[in-house]
Structures are given as structure tokens and as C-alpha cells.
Amino acid sequence: METATLVAIFISGLLVSFTGYALYTAFGQPSEQLRDPFEEHGD
């Protein structure tokens, strides 16, 4: 394979991995530990 193809596949894989981790953190099991600033600011 050509170098440019390998670099493109590597960067695409990193982007997909980062997006998956961000979605897991936002909506998965760890999201219960996140604080909600709107709930803390009760009017």
C-alpha cells in the first residue's frame, strides 16, 4: 500500500475511535459521574 493511504486509514481510525470514546463518555456508564451545571444552578 501507498504511504498516503496508510496515513489516511490511520487518521480515520483515530477519528472514529475518539468519536466512539466521546459518545461512550457522554451517554454510557461514565456519564453518571458527570456533573450538570444547570441542575446545580437552581432558581
Swiss-Prot record:
Pfam families: PsbN. This is Protein PsbN. GO terms for cellular component: chloroplast thylakoid membrane. Belongs to the PsbN family. The chain crosses the membrane at residues 7-27. GO terms for biological process: photosynthesis. The gene is psbN. It is a single-pass membrane protein. It is found in: Plastid, Chloroplast thylakoid membrane. It comes from the Eukaryota. Keywords: Chloroplast, Membrane, Plastid, Thylakoid, Transmembrane, Transmembrane helix. May play a role in photosystem I and II biogenesis.
